């Protein structure tokens, strides 16, 4: 590990935190019969509805194939509806999907916040958020190095 820069150590720590957080969230969300990915998809649909499958795929951390399978399952469970408007198929929440999200949302947000609230004060959280936003914006423009 001596050869690693602080940047690579931060990257590894973020990956480990993300994996641990996702595992714990998946376990936590079982009480609502949802996975972390499904929760994210329902939240994005509610926020931006109606939206297309491609628009949704850009907003979540699920592959295009994965999103298609997930939407089929969410539709079977009655959480979403897909409507064909001329050439465009849009996705919206049903009342049942809205109710499922409303049951899970406050508790999931509190659970996720606890990862930070338990160890960082408000000022530290603001600084971390600003730094992560800065890194995220840079990563969106980043290009792969030449071979």
UniProtKB/Swiss-Prot annotation:
The keyword Acetylation does not apply. InterPro entries: ArsR-like_HTH, HTH_MarR-typ, WH-like_DNA-bd_sf, WH_DNA-bd_sf. Residues 1-137 form the HTH marR-type domain. The keyword Kinase does not apply. One of its GO terms (molecular function) is DNA binding. Keywords: DNA-binding, Transcription, Transcription regulation. Residues 53-76 bind DNA. PANTHER family: TRANSCRIPTIONAL REGULATOR, MARR (PTHR42756), TRANSCRIPTIONAL REPRESSOR OF EMRAB OPERON (PTHR42756:SF1). This is Uncharacterized HTH-type transcriptional regulator BALH_1720. It comes from Bacillus thuringiensis (strain Al Hakam).
């Amino acid at each position: 590990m001596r050869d690693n820069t602080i940047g690579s150590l931060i990257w590894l720590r973020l990956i480990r935190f993300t994996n641990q957080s996702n595992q714990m969230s998946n376990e936590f969300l079982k009480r609502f019969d949802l996975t972390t990915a499904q929760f994210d998809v329902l939240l994005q649909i509610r926020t931006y509805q109606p939206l297309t499958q491609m628009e949704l795929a850009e907003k979540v951390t699920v592959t295009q194939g994965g999103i298609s399978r997930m939407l089929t399952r969410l539709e079977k469970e009655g959480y979403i509806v897909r409507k064909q408007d001329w050439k465009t198929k849009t996705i919206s929440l049903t009342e049942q999907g809205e109710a499922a999200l409303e049951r899970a949302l406050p508790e999931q947000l509190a659970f996720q916040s606890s990862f930070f609230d338990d160890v960082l004060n408000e000022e530290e959280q603001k600084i971390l958020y600003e730094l992560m936003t800065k890194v995220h914006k840079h990563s969106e423009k980043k290009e792969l190095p030449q071979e």
